[in-house]
């Protein structure tokens, strides 16, 4: 069975048991009245069941309801259908004031009907020939307004300076100031030029997101013809059907697949309504993607750190034990579905490098947008600074030093022999983003 953990906030006067049962029924065979066609099927076999209700500590009005829906209610290999069934109608339900899907358990029998990520972590490392460290990326800014040639130039400078990947911003599709084909060509030129000069494999996440599936495949085909290693998709705005289509194309044609989660906060920001990102992350692993953005943890609160690491493990590991302190409501066995690399991006710079290296470990992508391009000397030194900081942190960690305690010291030592890093350290020494975390247990 597929198990779902909901946080239910019933309307005043509605007991939590009734609200939980209503949620389970609406996600399966129930409707608002008894119908004669009920007699034509075995409702006992197909109905959803609410099997557990517990109070949410510290919140009088809400309860955590765990519902089970039989695997036969879902189409094989379709995340779209899974969500339509599990969360389709029930969120507008009159009896519940608010409803949040906290976690799903996907049984191995259902997991096996999905292709999952086109390649996974190990295959990606082998393709890129990069081992033993996180992968470095950078989003090209300003995200809108550059011409294709200048955009390609920015890409080249970053890759030449020492980054592994650069990235199209999620909003860069094919706008009047830069059509997709021109961008693809100039970025491919930047990739090949920087590869030839550095002897490392480089890539640029070419955003193939478009208005129709056919147009997306057309862009992916063009990327494959250019011989570039990776394309990108906005999986929530593009939709799961489009995402799975593109993921299948990527596996068949040897393209890596980077996933951006634009629009996720619309769904996962509220504590009492919507869906937690760990559900969207699980869905992405089934639908297919080699990288997915997953927040940064750095500079925020500890509570959020555990929760973020919870869904990061759900993305990377084969088997994840139930652990309520990290927000994981069910044990999840992925049965050999390839892993997804979590991408840390958003407001990070060289001073965060020790923390990022420690928190995310080697299997991750660290993405610095402004943290590369904001360097006072330009993109290439900015990229060089990030690479030096990363190598210093990995080396220190391998020597057994404590990155959490000695992080700043490690960066300062490295800055002594890298003027680029020293300049970066100077620029970003005071910047902090101090806000309360939304996502606490």
Swiss-Prot record:
Name by which UniProt lists this protein: Ribulose bisphosphate carboxylase large chain
PANTHER family documented for this protein: RIBULOSE BISPHOSPHATE CARBOXYLASE, RIBULOSE BISPHOSPHATE CARBOXYLASE LARGE CHAIN
Post-translational modification: The disulfide bond which can form in the large chain dimeric partners within the hexadecamer appears to be associated with oxidative stress and protein turnover.
Subcellular location(s) per record: Plastid, Chloroplast
Residues with PTM N6-carboxylysine: 167
Keyword check for ATP-binding: no
GO annotation, cellular component aspect: chloroplast
Domain of life from the UniProt record: Eukaryota
Positions contributing to Mg(2+) binding: 167, 169-170
EC number: 4.1.1.39
Biological-process GO terms, alphabetical: photorespiration; reductive pentose-phosphate cycle
Broad class of where this protein is predominantly found: plastid
Family to which this protein belongs: Belongs to the RuBisCO large chain family. Type I subfamily.
Required co-factors: Mg(2+)
Miscellaneous comment in the UniProt entry for this protein: The basic functional RuBisCO is composed of a large chain homodimer in a 'head-to-tail' conformation. In form I RuBisCO this homodimer is arranged in a barrel-like tetramer with the small subunits forming a tetrameric 'cap' on each end of the 'barrel'.
Keywords, alphabetical: Calvin cycle, Carbon dioxide fixation, Chloroplast, Disulfide bond, Lyase, Magnesium, Metal-binding, Monooxygenase, Oxidoreductase, Photorespiration, Photosynthesis, Plastid
Gene: rbcL
InterPro entries assigned: RuBisCO, RuBisCo_large_chain_AS, RuBisCO_lsu_C, RuBisCO_lsu_C_sf, RuBisCO_lsu_fd_N, RuBisCO_lsu_N_sf, RuBisCO_lsuI
Residues the entry annotates as binding substrate: 89, 139, 143, 261, 293, 345
Keyword Chloroplast: yes
Pfam families assigned: RuBisCO_large (PF00016), RuBisCO_large_N (PF02788)
Active site: 141 (proton acceptor), 260 (proton acceptor)
Site (described: Transition state stabilizer): 300
